[in-house]
């Protein structure tokens, strides 16, 4: 079974997400001479259609702040986010439209899975939101489970609490 979304970039690859000089500083203390934490300082990168971005770094280096900025859970001090050629938050690309296309996978597997949904339901949820039929979404969920080494017949109907940390 093939993934539902096949990206044919044909020709030169165009960035799907372009981050230009993203800045977020936190000001600690209200008095003159207060400390400034430069959590994200002029970060720039591009993600080409079909690519997956993973961010790795030392504790406190700005990974989570960068992710929050990309999701617009925090506002940047400076810089721009361009998604599919449109500036995020502009009149041409609403936050709702942007957030339907971009997602963040949290590093805490216990908090990122809905405890009231089976693995199959959790995996199929994103497909269903985008109009994929229940049958196709279920088949894709089974494909993905098998792809990561979890036998669908054994794991599709389990709830997150019934899986080990590594399986989550």
Q: Residue locations for each model-derived region?
A:
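ABC transporter nucleotide-binding domains
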Residues: 1-168
């Amino acid at each position: 079974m093939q993934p539902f979304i096949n990206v044919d970039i044909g020709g030169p690859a165009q960035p799907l997400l372009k981050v230009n000089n993203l800045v977020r500083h936190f000001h600690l203390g209200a008095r003159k001479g207060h400390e400034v934490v430069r959590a994200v300082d002029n970060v720039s990168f591009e993600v080409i259609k079909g690519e997956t971005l993973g961010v790795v770094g030392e504790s406190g280096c700005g990974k989570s702040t960068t992710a929050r900025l990309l999701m617009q859970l925090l506002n940047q001090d400076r810089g721009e986010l361009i998604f599919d050629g449109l500036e995020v938050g502009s009149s041409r690309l609403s936050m709702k439209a942007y957030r339907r296309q971009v997602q963040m996978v949290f590093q805490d597997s216990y908090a990122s899975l809905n405890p009231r949904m089976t693995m199959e339901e959790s995996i199929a949820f994103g497909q269903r939101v985008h109009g994929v039929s229940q049958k196709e979404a279920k088949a894709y969920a089974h494909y993905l489970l098998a792809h990561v080494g979890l036998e669908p017949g054994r794991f599709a109907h389990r709830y997150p609490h019934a899986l080990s940390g590594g399986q989550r």
